[in-house]
């Protein structure tokens, strides 16, 4: 048995705070750190000193890019709980960083969704919400900025219902709004809470509910109790008998339904004005899961069978690396979530994805950007290790005697690329090192060298993503670089099936070369990827040459069919062929496979695919006509229009190629008042006139 822990596992919460860019997520996190006693002076984003945003660019741009993990402790607003440990993973809200969000959601157990009381549910909130649904993450909602002009709590609650298809259950109501926002009503305790402004909200007083709010409170309290009662027959019977439930029963019922993802308890406040954050921390403890409340993580055992690891110190050690960060003081930091077992500093771990054993140097518990060295980590913990060389994002690290590979994360393919070159000879070598490190940290960022032009090409999820990479090269690695024009990552595919022979024979004195194959090349569903099948019977092509044929096909796919872009979504089957006892070789069959694919694919109705982006524009009504006209000129397909407090929302699908420089154009169209978000949606066939122009340009 493992030795007793300082804080039992059921008193640990691994949470993320997710939100749209300006909903006030970083300020909320800051206040959490302040009230839990970690942070002695509150950081403000608009002064550029927030604790969580520790990369320089984040402080300049005021947006959060890297998900730092922070540990803090909470005893409750009235010191009513035993000590709980809360690990907070900061998630970015900008759409170019969806990969960061995916990563953090993968290792959290619960989340707090922060909404702006004025902007409500923004397009970005919808994206993150969908991602959280995919990982079945239980959530609380916090309607922030209740002190802002235009604040409206119930409107946001309705948007959570209508736009996010969630079931919001307010457990608080605001007292007043805008500059009259004074405090909140706790619907469970039936009390008003007023935070004391003199000590920055550290103390508060409980008071009776204001007369003019009693009817409203009664209405929402009943909805909340009904939601709690629906958690079990037992509670429902008690409610029907007594017409009420005790505070403990309400919390128990709400917790059960939150963990089952049936409801989202909603709270409100103003983080900036120090109102409501401690009550939010209490709700994290009351309603969000501990590692023991979530299902055991699944994975693949060493023998290929399905296995799992439950959150216990007594199980074999298994953890998932979810973030790699370069740190100026200690080198590479690997952030990981422990799912089972115990790891001590100095232990060796096994990485089944890379097939490598590594020794853990130091273990650090992170407080945003300061660090505390610890001796061990246990199931449910989140920590950072120093000194791991081969581990990349999404890898498993585990006990060597009990190998398991935890489910890998899926990372999106990059959709945009730019050529980049160092400004001076001295920068040349440093640039290679810098790009390598950045690619190790961020799986949605790729680097390769273009064979023809010998240029270094970097690829990513959007213009902002690549701008920040170039910016980090300059700051962290002192590399100055010139950046080319952004280029779109087109793809090619085929529309019909074909059978094609590829025969490679060279007989010129001495040993010749002989490879002969017949391939069937067929289109697959969009997004289905590449499949290679061996249907050879009777050994007409010996088995040892089959991998060479596949290799030849794959290499030719990288070179494209008509325009030199990678081919996707095809199935290739080798079904016939012949060989020569002496002259056949892997090389010959690789060339034969490559020839057959090149020849066959070019006759199979090849088409060019272009990335289509899902774009949402929010614009004041008076610019609506210009904005829509401009989107139509960009080959946009309008999918729908909606109203929001910030103006009209236009939902549109636009080819990425037409979106370069859109930020600047939109600013001038709307005098800086319209905003947009953009994320990759799918690849679709480019119209023939566009495709022809691109092919011509390529050749």
Curated annotation (Swiss-Prot):
Domain tr-type G: 10-292
Predominant location category: cytoplasm
Compartments (UniProt record): Cytoplasm
GO annotation terms (biological process): ribosome disassembly
CDD domains: EF-G, EFG_III, EFG_mtEFG1_IV, EFG_mtEFG_C, EFG_mtEFG_II
Origin superkingdom: Bacteria
Keywords, in A-Z order: Cytoplasm, Elongation factor, GTP-binding, Nucleotide-binding, Protein biosynthesis
UniProt-annotated stretches for the region Disordered: 292-312
Sites where the protein binds GTP: 19-26, 90-94, 144-147
Entry GO MF terms: GTP binding; GTPase activity; guanosine tetraphosphate binding; translation elongation factor activity
GO cellular component: cytoplasm
GTP-binding recorded as keyword: yes
Homology family: Belongs to the TRAFAC class translation factor GTPase superfamily. Classic translation factor GTPase family. EF-G/EF-2 subfamily.
Functional note: Catalyzes the GTP-dependent ribosomal translocation step during translation elongation. During this step, the ribosome changes from the pre-translocational (PRE) to the post-translocational (POST) state as the newly formed A-site-bound peptidyl-tRNA and P-site-bound deacylated tRNA move to the P and E sites, respectively. Catalyzes the coordinated movement of the two tRNA molecules, the mRNA and conformational changes in the ribosome.
Name under which the protein is recorded: Elongation factor G
Species of the source: Coxiella burnetii (strain CbuK_Q154) (Coxiella burnetii (strain Q154))
Gene expressing this chain: fusA
């Amino acid at each position: 048995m493992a030795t007793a822990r300082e804080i039992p596992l059921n008193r640990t919460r691994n949470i993320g705070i997710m939100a749209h860019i300006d909903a006030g997520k970083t300020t909320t996190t800051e206040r959490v750190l302040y009230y839990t006693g970690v942070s002695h002076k509150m950081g403000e984003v608009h002064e550029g000193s927030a604790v969580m945003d520790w990369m320089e660019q984040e402080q300049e741009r005021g947006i959060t890019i890297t998900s730092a993990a922070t540990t803090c402790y909470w005893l409750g607003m009235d010191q009513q709980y035993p000590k709980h440990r809360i690990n907070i993973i900061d998630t970015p809200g900008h759409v170019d960083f969806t990969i960061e969000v995916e990563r953090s959601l993968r290792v959290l157990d619960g989340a707090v969704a922060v909404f702006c009381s004025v902007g409500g549910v923004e397009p970005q909130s919808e994206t993150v919400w969908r991602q959280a649904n995919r990982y079945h993450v239980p959530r609380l909602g916090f309607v922030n900025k209740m002190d802002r002009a235009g604040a409206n709590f119930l409107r946001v609650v309705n948007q959570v219902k209508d736009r996010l298809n969630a079931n919001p259950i307010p457990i608080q109501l605001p007292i007043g709004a805008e500059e009259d926002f004074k405090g909140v009503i706790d619907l469970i305790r039936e009390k008003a809470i007023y935070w004391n402004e003199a000590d920055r909200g550290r103390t508060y007083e409980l008071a009776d509910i204001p007369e003019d709010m009693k009817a409203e409170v009664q209405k929402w309290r009943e909805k909340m109790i009904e939601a709690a009662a629906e958690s079990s027959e037992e509670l429902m019977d008690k409610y029907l008998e007594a017409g009420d439930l005790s505070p403990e029963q309400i919390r128990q019922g709400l917790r059960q339904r939150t963990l089952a993802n049936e409801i989202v308890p909603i709270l409100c406040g103003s983080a900036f004005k120090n109102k409501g954050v401690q009550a939010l921390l209490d709700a994290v403890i009351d309603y969000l899961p501990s590692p023991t409340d979530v299902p055991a993580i699944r994975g693949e055992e060493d023998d290929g069978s399905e296995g799992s690891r439950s959150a216990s110190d007594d199980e074999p050690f298994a953890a998932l690396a979810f973030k790699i960060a370069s740190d100026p003081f200690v080198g590479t930091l690997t952030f990981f979530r422990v799912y089972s077992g115990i790891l001590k500093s100095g232990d060796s771990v096994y990485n089944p994805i890379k097939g490598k054993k590594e020794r853990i140097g130091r273990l650090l518990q992170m407080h945003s950007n300061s660090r505390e060295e610890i001796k061990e980590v246990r199931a449910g913990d989140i920590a950072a290790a120093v000194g791991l060389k081969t581990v990349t994002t999404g890898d498993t690290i585990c006990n060597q005697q009990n190998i398991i590979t935890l489910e890998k994360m899926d990372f999106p393919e990059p959709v945009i690329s730019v050529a980049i070159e160092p400004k001076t000879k001295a920068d040349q070598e440093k640039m290679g090192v810098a790009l390598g490190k950045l690619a190790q940290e961020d799986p949605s960022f790729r680097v390769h060298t273009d064979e023809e032009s010998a240029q270094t090409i970097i690829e990513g999820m959007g213009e902002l993503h690549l701008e920040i990479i170039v910016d980090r090269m300059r700051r962290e690695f002192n590399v100055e670089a010139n950046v080319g024009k952004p280029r779109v990552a087109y793809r090619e595919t085929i529309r019909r099936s074909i059978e094609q022979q590829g025969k490679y024979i060279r007989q010129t004195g001495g040993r010749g070369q002989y490879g002969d194959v017949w391939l069937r090349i067929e289109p697959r569903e969009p997004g289905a990827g590449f499949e290679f099948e061996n249907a050879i019977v009777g050994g007409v092509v010996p088995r040892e040459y089959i991998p060479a044929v596949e290799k030849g096909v794959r290499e030719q796919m990288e070179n494209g069919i008509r325009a030199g872009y990678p081919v996707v979504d095809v199935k290739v089957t080798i079904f016939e062929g012949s060989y020569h006892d002496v002259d056949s070789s892997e090389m010959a069959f690789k060339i034969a496979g490559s020839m057959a694919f090149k020849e066959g694919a070019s006759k199979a109705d090849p088409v060019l695919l272009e990335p289509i982006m899902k774009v949402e524009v929010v614009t004041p009504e008076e610019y609506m006509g210009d904005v829509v006209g401009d989107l139509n000129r960009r080959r946009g397909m309008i999918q729908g229009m909606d109203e929001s407090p910030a103006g009209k929302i236009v939902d549109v699908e636009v080819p990425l190629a037409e979106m370069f420089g859109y930020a600047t154009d939109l600013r001038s169209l709307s005098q800086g008042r319209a905003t947009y978000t953009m994320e990759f949606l799918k690849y679709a066939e480019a119209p023939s006139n566009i495709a022809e122009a691109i092919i011509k340009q390529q050749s």
